[in-house]
Amino acid sequence: MKTGLCLHGFQEKPVSGSPEAIVNDSLRRFAKIVQMSLPTSSSDARKVEFERESMSYWKMQHRASAQSVNLVQRPSGAGALLAVTDPRLDRRIGGEPVWLAQNADAIASHLEAVLGQRVKIRDAARAGFYVKLETYPDIKAPLPGELFDWLRPHLTSESYSQLLSWFGESCSIVSRWIALELPGDAGAPIYCLNLRDRSLAQNKAVKLGVRAGRRVKAKFSNPDITLSQSAINILDRAEILSRDRNSKLDVLASARVIVVGQGSLGAPVALHLARSGVGHLTLVDPDQLTASNLGRHVLGASDLGRNKAEAMCARLRSDVPIVTIKAIPSYVELALIKNREDFEKADLIVVTSADWESEETLWRAKSVGASWKLIQAWSEPHALVGHALVAADVSADAKSLFEDNGRFRHKYTNWPRGDSVPLPACGQSFIPGGGLGVSAIASMVAAAAIEQLTSDSRDILWISRISNPQRVSALEGEYVGPELPDGATEMTLRRPWPEVFPNA
């Protein structure tokens, strides 16, 4: 939804529609401009309108910088920022951004997560400055020599003094950045100015801090600068999750979840939990990624041969850097012993391994007083039906809902040829199912996990997702589950556990 009039049009979006609609839209914008220009118009309304779009107007006057900026956490106040680049990212993401932070350790930790290897910062330059604007500067962007006069009325005297000191101390650096946080509450937009020595080629990126023992410096103590604008991304929790209006994000930040199984179901569950703001994830899986996994796994060909838990750990650290993630490349039966502290601290365990020995082990621990909540989730063959058993109660035990071989007693599909496809290896098999169906079941499981982490519910739940059950017969199976309402192709059911049977 557009929040302002945006008199110049919506970014660079092409105009579409009928000729009449385009002309009417242009006339409407022109009429608004005329109305706002009249002596009788409200100066306050005009001021608010232009302030709302101030960044748009500044960007129209400043060319884009050759380098974007990644700000590692939003600073709490005005001050200098250290700047680092890493040439390895140039090959990985098609450009070499500048990483800004108040201290070098924050940048090093962040780059280590992104690159998957330790980064040594040798000489971080104080090439950035962060400041909060008290009021809005004029929408007419300043010339380089007018920058400080343009900013001065809109900064506190202390912030302005700090900015001048930083500018003088950093004048030997050929490319610098000033991050201007707009007026308003915490989390206001940031406009980033790039101050570059005029001797630099227009599209030349500078390298700072990593691998080079020296920083690039200007030839003169008072360089003649140019002004451009750098795209800026704030890589902190508040910004990354800013479009999720879940009121329980603070609760999720401290939550600890262990996901047992990083296959086609467990991996997307872990990804959903990370992107939902769960603060601490531990991933458990002993297996390696193979080519046959790629059709329905979130990992790709570059991870073939790697342990699934370790590969997903690296993937999530890179993609969602606000989450603390640990990999345990082992069977959960061993992890319960060797990594006991991780399980003792856990709030929730989600097991998606489709391995009855590991599932039974966790139910046994749950039945004798383990404090963590437990969700066992799996898909029936061909991923048209998925289930999750949720246990919040300390002494819950679902083992009796399964036969001795781990087959669920209340399944919704029957398959004369068997539930799994054997592989040419000792005891190895897989449950057939496409990536689309598994992904939908993963969303159901992740939603159940978030609910358990953010509520005080002590209920035991059986959640099932059913999709296109008519396809079961086409796949030579039999559907024996509940009928869907007329016109529905999918359905999710929530109810207490089914009747408990004693194990045979």
Protein language model regions, located:
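Glycine-rich phosphate-binding loop and adjoining beta1-alpha1-beta2 segment
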Residues: 286-321
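Hydrophobic/aromatic beta-strand patches that form the interior of the parallel beta-sheet core
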Residues: 258, 282-284, 328, 348-350, ...
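Glycine-rich adenosine-cofactor-binding loop
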Residues: 245-288
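N-terminal charged helix/coil linker that caps or initiates catalytic domains
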Residues: 199-257
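Ser/Thr/Pro-rich, low-complexity mucin-like regions
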Residues: 25-44
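A structured beta-alpha segment of the ubiquitous adenosine-cofactor-binding alpha/beta core
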Residues: 313-347, 353-355
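Compact alpha/beta protein-protein interaction domains typified by the UBC
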Residues: 1-7, 21
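Glycine-rich phosphate/adenylate-binding loop
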Residues: 49, 55, 59-218, 344-348, ...
